[in-house]
Swiss-Prot record:
Residues 1-29 are annotated as: Disordered. Keywords: Glycoprotein, Membrane, Transmembrane, Transmembrane helix. GO terms for cellular component: plasma membrane. It comes from Monascus ruber (Mold). Belongs to the major facilitator superfamily. CAR1 family. MFS transporter; part of the gene cluster that mediates the biosynthesis the mycotoxin citrinin, a hepato-nephrotoxic compound to humans due to inhibition of respiration complex III. This is Citrinin biosynthesis cluster MFS transporter mrr1. It is a multi-pass membrane protein. Its main location: membrane. The gene is mrr1. Pfam families: MFS_1 (PF07690). It is found in: Membrane. InterPro entries: MFS, MFS_dom, MFS_trans_sf.
Length: 499
């Protein structure tokens, strides 16, 4: 029972090596008689990432979160330029919305590559490669003279940038314990939302200024490069199998005994195993696992709502309220940011006061993740109806902007606790569950902005947002049912271990 309690690895999503992470932190030597198999020298091994000092763990987490902010920032900053670029390239605003959608579509495909690479080569090599190429693809966006170049560059910067989103959650699991890991992941999750929320605000002021829309790419490239260099100079490798492989290589050179080897040397994942873990099994689980299906639908909805709002907010504040400045019209996004930070704080408190004591007493079950999600499921429709029905120009802008707070809280808490629940439920096949969730979620996030303009123009801000509110109400029973009946449903699963 204790092994299963310590096993859950919290993450935001996306095909990182969660399945291997559950066995890595123990630091215990295997009972096999192979004296040349290199393992950790017990749980207090100074090279074990779990034994990094607190300051080092915190610094690594902050750097990881900063990289995440700039990747997700890039996904939304271009939304502020949709209007002006539609005129420059002689297409509709809906077509230019593809600039945002294609980046999020890159988030869909990327984890299928970066997740396996992190298992084979460690965390840092694929992270650095992907992040560097993400930075490079800002250049064709900034200098594009035709629509095709612009759209292709937006897709590929999403594809390569998602190396951070795919690898960092698993890297955090390498050096944080179960309770502290949940708090570290909350910081990472907040970063995944802070970036896209700031994108339209900063992008709006850039487009309004004399710099022009092309500087939305340059302003992403400059700080992303700066923090990328800091990461390159400071981040250590944390993936346990690769560290042990390096130790084995070092021992071979020092002792001239060529028999020293690590588990990764003798059990390198095959291409077929990787395909099974990241593609075939996720598709199979989407057909067979009701918990995965329902949670994926719910998380995909809130992810789609977030990216839909990059279109809806300018309509609500520029068109309906007649705010002229793109930057000023994007400032109400700060309401969502406040909600995200409040949600992050509430999840951290709930983890400390509710989840951690149960974990310590050995009485924790996956459903203990769900109470904050149930609260969030109620907050989200409240915020959506609040936003929609305070959109009239005859009502002050302040109530509509404040409505972003419960929306942000709802999105963050549903996201975090929903993904944590999936990981706790599926444990050994957590990678496959997260790959399935990432695939569907990112596809929905890419699709929602494409119909947002037509929906809001046709229905109006009030009824269009109310439609989202009704959809979110329909989702409320999901965490409630799983809280009360999740154990019985898990007992029927082919993939969930017995708690």
């Amino acid at each position: 029972m204790k092994e299963e309690i310590d096993a859950p690895v919290s993450t935001d999503a996306s095909g990182t090596d969660l399945e291997n992470a559950r066995d890595q932190p123990s630091g215990e030597k295997p009972t096999a008689v192979d004296i040349y198999l290199v393992e950790w020298d017990g749980p207090n091994d100074p090279e074990l990432p779990m034994n990094f000092p607190l300051w080092k763990k915190s610094l690594i987490t902050c750097i990881f979160s900063t990289l995440t902010i700039w990747v997700t920032f890039s996904s939304s900053v271009f939304s502020a330029a949709a209007g002006i670029t539609s005129k420059e390239f002689h297409v509709s605003v809906e077509v230019m919305t593809l600039g945002t959608s294609l980046t999020v579509l890159g988030f869909t495909v990327g984890p299928l590559v970066w997740g396996p690479m992190s298992e084979l080569y460690g965390r840092l090599k694929p992270l650095y490669i992907g992040y560097a190429i993400f930075i490079i693809f800002q250049v064709p966006v900034a200098v594009a003279q035709n629509l095709e170049t612009l759209m292709l560059a937006r897709f590929f910067l999403g594809f390569f940038g998602t190396s951070a989103l795919a690898i960092i959650p698993g890297a955090l699991a390498d050096f944080w314990g179960p309770v502290e890991r949940a708090i570290a992941i909350s910081l990472f999750s907040a970063a995944t939302f802070v970036g896209p929320i700031f994108g339209p605000i900063i992008g709006g002021f850039i487009v309004d200024s004399s710099l022009g829309w092309r500087w939305t790419a340059w302003i992403t490239m400059i700080p992303a490069s700066f923090f990328g260099i800091i990461a390159f100079l400071t981040l250590p490798e944390t993936y346990h199998p690769v560290l042990l492989q390096r130790r084995a290589s070092r021992l071979r050179k020092e002792t001239r005994i060529w028999a020293y080897h690590s588990r990764l040397d003798e059990n390198t994942p095959t291409f077929g195993e990787i395909l099974t873990k990241y593609l075939f099994r996720p598709i199979q689980m989407l057909f067979l696992e009701p918990i995965l299906v329902c949670m994926t639908i719910y998380i995909s909805l809130i992810y789609g709502i977030l990216y839909l709002f990059f279109v809806a907010y300018p309509i609500a504040f520029r068109e309906v309220r007649n705010w002229k400045s793109l930057g000023i019209a994007a400032l109400p996004f700060l309401g969502i940011l406040v909600g995200v930070l409040m949600g992050c704080l509430l999840v951290t408190i709930a983890t400390r006061l509710w989840y951690a004591p149960k974990l310590q007493n050995g009485s924790v079950v996956p459903e203990d993740r769900l109470p904050p999600m149930i609260v969030a499921a109620i907050l989200l429709p409240i915020g959506l109806f609040w936003f929609g029905w305070t959109s009239s120009p005859s009502i002050s802008w302040a109530p509509q902007a404040i409505a972003g707070a419960p929306i942000g809280m709802g999105i963050l808490m549903i996201w975090m606790q929903g993904l944590n629940y999936l990981i706790d439920v599926y444990l050994v096949v957590a990678n496959s569950a997260m790959s399935a969730n990432t695939l569907i979620r990112s596809a929905v996030g890419a699709a929602f902005p494409l119909f947002a303009t037509a929906m809001y123009h046709k229905l109006g801000v009030d009824w269009a947002t109310s439609l989202l509110g009704f959809l979110s109400i329909a989702m409320i029973p999901i965490p409630v049912i799983f809280y009360f009946y999740g154990a019985k449903i898990r007992a029927l699963s082919r993939f969930s271990p017995k708690w």
